[in-house]
Amino acid sequence: KYICIRPEIKNFIETSFDIDPTKTTVIYNSFDETRFKHYPLPKKKRVLFVGTIDYLRKLTIEDLIKTTKEENKELWIVGKKRADYLDNLLEPHVKYFEPTWNVEKYIKECDETAGILLGRTTIEGWLSNRPGWIYDVDETGNILGKTFNKVPDDVEKFHSKNAINNILKSYEDIL
């Protein structure tokens, strides 16, 4: 059985490789719900983007800089610089931070997250009761779409204990 970390990957595997849907399942990456939990919202409107600063995220970051400026919000960007374009894009409402494992420090200080596809920052934000912007991008970073996503009612499906139980169930089904 093929374990996929999000529905889009499941669909991609089934359609690109002609895999029978009964041979695939979605088990989301697990998240430590003791680290990512409901925190009070900050007073200042702030969007958090966490990700590698590279060609794939350039147009997304440019869009976030423009959108947050228009909406009078701060934009915090956390990530490893693998391209030098960010230095030319920073504006007074944008702050850059080096990568860190302690991302919850930044999530606590934002009221929304943003990222490409359904990634860690969006899910960690949801677990912390923050809605998130999800950018759909192609393999070159072109923006195909952008959606604002409220915290899902079934956010507990991302808890580590549920991921473990789903993995065990998949093994039991195979055996």
Ranges and model annotations:
Residues 146-175:
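A charged, aromatic-enriched C-terminal amphipathic alpha-helix characteristic of glycosyltransferases
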Residues 108-120, 130-131:
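Acidic donor-binding loop of glycosyltransferase active sites
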Residues 1-23:
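A short, active-site helix/loop in glycosyltransferases that binds the activated sugar's phosphate group
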Residues 46-88:
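Conserved catalytic-core segment of nucleotide-activated headgroup transferases in glycan assembly
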Residues 80-83, 94-107, 118-120:
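Conserved active-site histidine-acidic residue motif and adjacent donor-binding/catalytic loop
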Residues 8, 27-30:
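Carbohydrate-associated surface elements
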